[in-house]
Amino acid sequence: MESADSTGKGSIEQSESQRQSQMDRLDREEAFYQFVNNLNEDDYRLMRDNNLLGTPGEITKEELLRRLQQIKEGPPQPSTEETRGDSVSTGGDPAEDSSNGDSIIDWLNSVRQTGNTTRSGQRGNQSWRAVSRTNPNSGDFRFSLEINVNRTSGNPSMPSLDQSAEMPGAEDMEVSSQGEAENEPEPIPIATRSAPAEVTVEEAPIQRGQRRARSRSPDQRRTRARTDRSRSPLHHAVDPPIRRAPHSSSQTVDTSNTEEAEGSSRTRHHVSSQVQNSSSSNETEGSSRTRQHIPARQQVLGTEGQSQSTVHLSNPETRSSSQTPQTDSSTNAETTGTGQRPPTIVLDLQVRRVRPGDYRQRDSIANRTRSRSQTPNNTVTYESERGGFRRTFSRSERAGVRTYVSTIRIPIRRILNTGLSETTSVAIQTMLRQIMTGFGELSYFMYNDNDTDPNNPTAVSPTAAVPGEAQNNANAEVRAPSAEPTEPVAPVETDEGSNVSTTATRREGRNSRGAVTFEESGSLPFLSLAQFFLLNEDDDDQPRGLTKEQIDNLSTRNFGENDALKTCSVCITEYTEGNKLRKLPCSHEYHIHCIDRWLSENSTCPICRRAVLVASNRESIV
């Protein structure tokens, strides 16, 4: 009897405990709904975008208030002086920036969830700013990178040619979206550093009276010695067609050696690309060959105060009409055979380096006059398409501030719609290698400038190797760092009929010149972007949810006392007066926090399974 009584008491206590637990949960749910209903639009989005709302009934109202207050205040940011002092004390070693890798990954991963974010900071002489914006109607996503480097604020004891001091900082990202901007439907989290990029360059012969940039390593000196002996028909003002090396499986690369005068000496500029000033250059529409217009020389005395050296890599069928690659990439629409623009990734990478001395006087009349009289107006344009990948490069300098811009446009086509023979993973990896190739070329711009003595007014700064034609069967190959070097090579068919292999593995081509190996800093954000665009094969076939921007575009309302009694189909809870509801195009309504969480992982209505957005407005990466 005693055991039976104890068992009965135990069951009663257990049932009472369960009932109390259920009551507490109901109270927490009611408090949760009241908390959400009282939030303004900005606070609600802030908590939703940072996944702070949790599940109704599992978190107290006090905890929600604490989370809201904490996310509003934000983590304490280190002062600029402390950050600058830390950079100087560590000698500006890029390896020190690796600690910021996790925050970069988190930020990039949140782009997919938040749609719009802003971030900025400074470390030593490197400042950066990051903004992410998405167009909810078209799903357009534009990714831009801007890095500002003030060489005068670094450690004065560092040598001017020190790579770690010259290269841009760790996490300088600026993301902007425009209605007409091309689209990167869904950013993917990045991983670790990329492998170093290798660039094999054939330079034009150095002419008498010119000074060659100082080499950093014996390997580079040997390379330049070999390339100096090679002859390139860059001095003829003719338009040769593209040549392909017979023993090379990769697209051959033309040599461009653009010298820049920074003192009183005059330099000549022999460029193997199409000159933007010569806008009358004829390009055959629909032709599989891209013609380059090579001027015998360019004017040394520029007519404008701002000198630009712009190298454009773009679709030959869509010529660029602007000298600003960012404008070009955002205003030119890329179309498919059916006339519809496929989703496209747009990456704008911008690096600004400030030269010592000129920066302090960059606004002075004397400096503007010196810049106008001594800096040539050498604008160079090159247009090409590699399997649909458009790239634009530019370099400009004004009053000691040198700017490099690399714009890459990558159309992301669906396998089923375009009939591509590649699998999804191979297509994604091909896109990755194309992106990294462009980053490697941009880095080579800065690498050549690092070889130039900034204190030498007559030092020559050659530009980066630009894909084009091969001279004398000598290949100048631009290779990109691959996030996974063990992956098989994925060649890309080009308009010229040649294959481009952009892996980081060394190619033992018989006609290749000595490689100029550029050990790129792993702290550079656009090198860490390798796996940012490398998708999981399993994720490619899974349905994706909507972005926060697209969700926010759906209509909302408050449940009134005169409304018919209804129940949210997600949480199975009846609506009460004041509840915020979100209405889908199919007319079904749900609690705003319930349906928002659903739509972050799904794109259909939970009841009727209809698509919330039409296919053309949804974000898709394949």
From Swiss-Prot:
GO terms for cellular component: nucleus. It holds the Pfam family zf-RING_2. Coiled coil: none annotated. Residues 11-21, 272-289, 318-331 have a biased composition (Low complexity). It catalyses: S-ubiquitinyl-[E2 ubiquitin-conjugating enzyme]-L-cysteine + [acceptor protein]-L-lysine = [E2 ubiquitin-conjugating enzyme]-L-cysteine + N(6)-ubiquitinyl-[acceptor protein]-L-lysine. Residues 1-26, 67-386, 473-514 are annotated as: Disordered. A motif (PDZ-binding) lies at residues 619-622. Residues 216-242, 355-365 have a biased composition (Basic and acidic residues). Pathway: Protein modification; protein ubiquitination. A zinc finger (RING-type) spans 568-609. It is found in: Nucleus. Its main location: nucleus. Signal peptide: none annotated. The keyword Repressor does not apply. Shows overlapping expression with lhx1/lim1 and ldb1 in the gastrula mesoderm, and expression overlaps with ldb1 throughout early embryogenesis. After gastrulation, expression is gradually restricted to tissues originated from the ectoderm, the neuroectoderm, neural crest and epidermis, and subsequently to the neural tube as well as the head and tailbud region. Changing C594A: Almost completely abolishes suppression of secondary axis formation and organizer function, and disrupts ldb1 ubiquitination. Acts as an E3 ubiquitin-protein ligase specific for ldb1, mediating ubiquitination and proteasome-dependent degradation of excess ldb1 in a RING-dependent manner. Does not degrade ldb1 bound to lhx1/lim1, nor lim1 itself and thus contributes to the establishment of proper ldb1-lhx1/lim1 stoichiometry and the formation of a ldb1-lhx1/lim1 complex. Interferes with Spemann organizer function and suppresses secondary axis formation induced by ldb1 and lhx1/lim1. PANTHER family: E3 UBIQUITIN-PROTEIN LIGASE RLIM, SI:CH211-59O9.10. Forms homodimers through the C-terminal region. The N-terminus interacts with the homeobox of LIM/homeobox factor lhx1/lim1, with lhx3/lim3 and lhx5/lim5, and with the N-terminus of ldb1. This is E3 ubiquitin-protein ligase RNF12-A. The gene is rnf12-a.
